[in-house]
Amino acid sequence: MGPVGAEADENQTVEVKVEPYGPGHTTPRGELPPDPEPELIDSTKLVEVQVILILAYCSIILLGVVGNSLVIHVVIKFKSMRTVTNFFIANLAVADLLVNTLCLPFTLTYTLMGEWKMGPVLCHLVPYAQGLAVQVSTITLTVIALDRHRCIVYHLESKISKRISFLIIGLAWGISALLASPLAIFREYSLIEIIPDFEIVACTEKWPGEEKSVYGTVYSLSTLLILYVLPLGIISFSYTRIWSKLRNHVSPGAASDHYHQRRHKMTKMLVCVVVVFAVSWLPLHAFQLAVDIDSHVLDLKEYKLIFTVFHIIAMCSTFANPLLYGWMNSNYRKAFLSAFRCEQRLDAIHSEVSMTFKAKKNLEVKKNNGPTDSFSEATNV
């Protein structure tokens, strides 16, 4: 036996008290004990992961702020850009800009620090602002699709007036503010004890009643239906009919080749709109649905990292929208260039073509009262 066994009686129970040695403490022999291996490692605390997250969020913020600000600027500055469709696009840009400036910086900070250091006011405000902006964006995307469907499929010459468009925009914000209000009301800013004598400041949902999880699940599923499934169905239906109408339409006259090209460009843009909207939000919504169905998903080792990655993918739509609705349109391209050159006026890029079709309309109305011009005007933004 060793030295300890030699000094102790065989039938005597020896109680040995072991004192833990933390980092920086030495053993009786003056040695530093090895750091204990943690049972659960948060990947978002790794330096290389944090660098990637910072680059990703900063890129989204930069592209979103520049792109959305530019869209808003050209719609306000140039009179020829002040159309109903462009007002809706500018409203979409405002909502995305709200996410880029108010939500994403604090979301990044919360992810990197692991606790909420921004105080109780922002604890209630940031989630509400993000929910508000996302719902405004979704409603605006749906309104744009329905407006384009109304103009192109049904050849309606009398478009929505500017006054009505502002009313629709106001209703979109009002409805969204109401739908997002639970995110601000049922919120709690509190201290959470992770381990004894170690607390963190958290900003979490706090639903009323004994069955708190039920209320949260109902709201989450309702949001999924209202913000994703229903709008995606409406948008897909509208753009499918628009694409079919554009594909089957034949433009008579000398400018038919021009509108044949614009037809394919518009079809491509509309398909991109639906794909980006569906793909960017699908992972986050699917993951949230999995959490609602099975709460054990919260216990996943990399839950925080998975959620963050899906959130980044969803937020990519905030800078993709200006590209899809703005940069792929020739009028917006010219407006962007004029803004960079500090030009004070912007001539309509399709003015000559529009005049040609207006002249053709006068002749065609006399002959067969055809709807060609209403269709051609509807294809211009």
Curated annotation (Swiss-Prot):
<dbReference type="GO" id="GO:0099538">
    <property type="term" value="P:synaptic signaling via neuropeptide"/>
</dbReference>
<dbReference type="GO" id="GO:0007204">
    <property type="term" value="P:positive regulation of cytosolic calcium ion concentration"/>
</dbReference>
<keyword id="KW-0297">G-protein coupled receptor</keyword>
<dbReference type="GO" id="GO:0046010">
    <property type="term" value="P:positive regulation of circadian sleep/wake cycle, non-REM sleep"/>
</dbReference>
<dbReference type="GO" id="GO:0033603">
    <property type="term" value="P:positive regulation of dopamine secretion"/>
</dbReference>
<keyword id="KW-1133">Transmembrane helix</keyword>
<feature type="topological domain" description="Cytoplasmic">
    <location>
        <begin position="238"/>
        <end position="268"/>
    </location>
</feature>
<keyword id="KW-0675">Receptor</keyword>
<dbReference type="GO" id="GO:0007263">
    <property type="term" value="P:nitric oxide mediated signal transduction"/>
</dbReference>
<feature type="transmembrane region" description="Helical; Name=2">
    <location>
        <begin position="87"/>
        <end position="107"/>
    </location>
</feature>
<feature type="topological domain" description="Cytoplasmic">
    <location>
        <begin position="73"/>
        <end position="86"/>
    </location>
</feature>
<dbReference type="GO" id="GO:0001662">
    <property type="term" value="P:behavioral fear response"/>
</dbReference>
<dbReference type="InterPro" id="IPR017452">
    <property type="entry name" value="GPCR_Rhodpsn_7TM"/>
</dbReference>
<dbReference type="GO" id="GO:0007193">
    <property type="term" value="P:adenylate cyclase-inhibiting G protein-coupled receptor signaling pathway"/>
</dbReference>
<keyword id="KW-0449">Lipoprotein</keyword>
<dbReference type="GO" id="GO:0002793">
    <property type="term" value="P:positive regulation of peptide secretion"/>
</dbReference>
<feature type="transmembrane region" description="Helical; Name=4">
    <location>
        <begin position="166"/>
        <end position="186"/>
    </location>
</feature>
<keyword id="KW-0472">Membrane</keyword>
<dbReference type="GO" id="GO:0003214">
    <property type="term" value="P:cardiac left ventricle morphogenesis"/>
</dbReference>
<feature type="topological domain" description="Extracellular">
    <location>
        <begin position="108"/>
        <end position="124"/>
    </location>
</feature>
<dbReference type="GO" id="GO:0098793">
    <property type="term" value="C:presynapse"/>
</dbReference>
<feature type="transmembrane region" description="Helical; Name=1">
    <location>
        <begin position="52"/>
        <end position="72"/>
    </location>
</feature>
<keyword id="KW-1003">Cell membrane</keyword>
<dbReference type="GO" id="GO:0051967">
    <property type="term" value="P:negative regulation of synaptic transmission, glutamatergic"/>
</dbReference>
<dbReference type="GO" id="GO:0005929">
    <property type="term" value="C:cilium"/>
</dbReference>
<comment type="similarity">
    <text>Belongs to the G-protein coupled receptor 1 family.</text>
</comment>
<dbReference type="GO" id="GO:0003151">
    <property type="term" value="P:outflow tract morphogenesis"/>
</dbReference>
<dbReference type="GO" id="GO:0098978">
    <property type="term" value="C:glutamatergic synapse"/>
</dbReference>
<feature type="lipid moiety-binding region" description="S-palmitoyl cysteine">
    <location>
        <position position="342"/>
    </location>
</feature>
<feature type="topological domain" description="Extracellular">
    <location>
        <begin position="1"/>
        <end position="51"/>
    </location>
</feature>
<dbReference type="GO" id="GO:0045987">
    <property type="term" value="P:positive regulation of smooth muscle contraction"/>
</dbReference>
<feature type="topological domain" description="Extracellular">
    <location>
        <begin position="290"/>
        <end position="304"/>
    </location>
</feature>
<dbReference type="GO" id="GO:2000252">
    <property type="term" value="P:negative regulation of feeding behavior"/>
</dbReference>
<feature type="transmembrane region" description="Helical; Name=5">
    <location>
        <begin position="217"/>
        <end position="237"/>
    </location>
</feature>
<feature type="region of interest" description="Disordered">
    <location>
        <begin position="1"/>
        <end position="37"/>
    </location>
</feature>
<dbReference type="GO" id="GO:0090394">
    <property type="term" value="P:negative regulation of excitatory postsynaptic potential"/>
</dbReference>
<feature type="topological domain" description="Cytoplasmic">
    <location>
        <begin position="326"/>
        <end position="381"/>
    </location>
</feature>
<feature type="glycosylation site" description="N-linked (GlcNAc...) asparagine">
    <location>
        <position position="11"/>
    </location>
</feature>
<dbReference type="GO" id="GO:0141162">
    <property type="term" value="P:negative regulation of cAMP/PKA signal transduction"/>
</dbReference>
<dbReference type="GO" id="GO:0010811">
    <property type="term" value="P:positive regulation of cell-substrate adhesion"/>
</dbReference>
<comment type="function">
    <text>Receptor for neuropeptide Y and peptide YY.</text>
</comment>
<dbReference type="Pfam" id="PF00001">
    <property type="entry name" value="7tm_1"/>
</dbReference>
